[in-house]
């Protein structure tokens, strides 16, 4: 009997609303070819159950597994006693004046047309307002500046100015990166013109600050690679090696710290608000030119004010999140991880425009619910209980709790109430009812959890391909993104939504990215908890003799390929879908990727993740 179709005998009204997973529409799209390339045979493997984990006896005398997770780091006292003065009117008025002054700086650049630095000056302004996190105020100015730069773009790149005789690596690398990220059709072949006669990138032996900065921008550009762009891979290897060697030679200064940040976070794990916080510390410290100093002072003051003013908004939102967490009964759910503040911080780092409060709170709530459900299906619930819960969710009726164990009743109502509330918010933003659409996404997610619970209970180990197909759904990327995304002031009509959400390649890749990266960070801890099934174990079973190191190497190759495909899905020209519509889903991928950068930062949030929360959420920037 198919596990997904099993219905509780207690209620004949519990009906299956969609197909069992074995016939799901969640197919492997970009990965079937990759799997064949990696030599992964398609066959079933069995393994005995592994439950080397501490258990606890519940009130019903059932021995239940526990994850041994640390408790919530951000209790009521921490949140309730936050206080910042930057919500006061005087700070907002000062920020508005600075915004006007920075607009004047953009406008003054048109007076320098035809000079020897007009192109690099425009790129410098655009790059810096973006890295400082203040670009939302200057959308028109940015477009005007980039249109001007692109009008002088050639297949060999650009120089510092329109009167420059030769092209320049720094201008070209920065221009290529910025133009590509804004959707201009620029070819990576432009970088080939900076290789020597035997096709290799070479560095200037003088190693001036300009030479070093050229390599910084070459490295940053190389990370925005599309599939098949070999020159970008060469540029990344060369510039990364150069910058690492340079760090060993130059003294500690703002440039060395900038290089360290760029190497540490790259682009795919460099969340916009985190980048702004780090860049504020190094921006303009070594500027010697008086005119440049005046520009940097205004940009820096505005960036600091904007960062701190947003924290006053976050305080209010955190209070709202804390009320929801308490009212939902979450503190009484003792078997799960409580990371709602960490999830809120991630959301704040990718969407920190004031009007996106619904997204930030919705993302934190959705991710908290996902975590509770994940821990319940993986650890705490029995298979029979989980069948009941899965069927109850498909009924979508509070009376469905009658057939649930006591500990599941509150969890069910948390899901039911929160999904309904987020659907109401989405209806206000999108002008249509999306509840049934969201329910289907949640049902698909729970079906995939149910499949994994069956594997855990029976000790069954699927093929890599089958595991990944199910794992893309159980990654829960889709349900974490869908409803929060629909609360934004970005239009998502049905024809656009299907290019961003399921069944789009963007959604498929985002889900795969989270599953692959998550498994490389979690598989050892999961195994200790009795969860044998992972990308690593399935790959090793499919490839007898392969070691864990072999499996990790293969997965890292796949992840690198997925990143390039994600870049393409976001930035490909003439897709008919605005970049702004795709970018929030793309940035959610970056947020999850950051959470797994050093370890499983969601299970163990007391180290790097805690520092991340402190730096971007709780600590103001000194003015």
From Swiss-Prot:
Gene Ontology BP annotations: alpha-pinene metabolic process; diterpenoid biosynthetic process; green leaf volatile biosynthetic process; terpenoid biosynthetic process
InterPro entries registered for this protein in UniProt: Isoprenoid_synthase_dom_sf, Terpene_cyclase-like_1_C, Terpene_cyclase_plant_C1, Terpene_synth_N, Terpene_synth_N_sf, Terpene_synthase-like, Terpene_synthase_metal-bd, Terpenoid_cyclase/PrenylTrfase
Binding site for Mg(2+) 1: 374, 378
Keywords: Chloroplast, Lyase, Magnesium, Metal-binding, Plastid, Transit peptide
Cofactor(s) in the UniProt record: Mg(2+); Mn(2+)
Presequence positions on this chain: 1-52
CC cofactor note: Binds 3 Mg(2+) or Mn(2+) ions per subunit.
Free-text comment about domains: The Asp-Asp-Xaa-Xaa-Asp/Glu (DDXXD/E) motif is important for the catalytic activity, presumably through binding to Mg(2+).
Family stated for the protein in its record: Belongs to the terpene synthase family. Tpsd subfamily.
UniProt name for this protein: (-)-alpha-pinene synthase 1, chloroplastic
Native organism: Pinus banksiana
Lineage: Eukaryota, Viridiplantae, Streptophyta, Embryophyta, Tracheophyta
